[in-house]
Amino acid sequence: MPYPINEGAARRAKEMNSFSDYKEGSATAEYRAMVDKAAAIAEKQKSRVDPMYHEKIDHLLDTYARKLAENMNQGFAIDARVPSVMIAGPANFPVGKKEKQNRARDSNMEEWRYIQGLLDKIRSTGMGGISADDPAVIEKLQKKLDGLERSQLIMK
């Protein structure tokens, strides 16, 4: 399920914005840690909900992993466009290009926030009510009714 992270782009982004050296594999390690955390959230949610929701949770997890990799790779490409003023120096610094880069960073950050929202979708899958437009609505309602009837019998 993990998607590739462009380590070359991550290195270039680090070199354009920092005097410290890039640690090989650190971008992939950061990505894997985030995906592992999402996978743990998904497994916890699967243990709490009916098995009919497991496929949806897996799909959301895969979407999270794919979009996160795309977002991180895009972020590295954006960061590598224009060097930091600390790296390039103030003489003939391309202010217009830097402003364009900052707008692209803002857009990339909005996308990242949306991707993090997928974790909330994973956490809430199977916890809400039954939707009338759900193709398995009758099956779900019957299962819920059976469970409520069993609870009623136990209470008697």
PLM ranges: what are they?
Residues M1-K156:
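Long, charge-dense low-complexity segments
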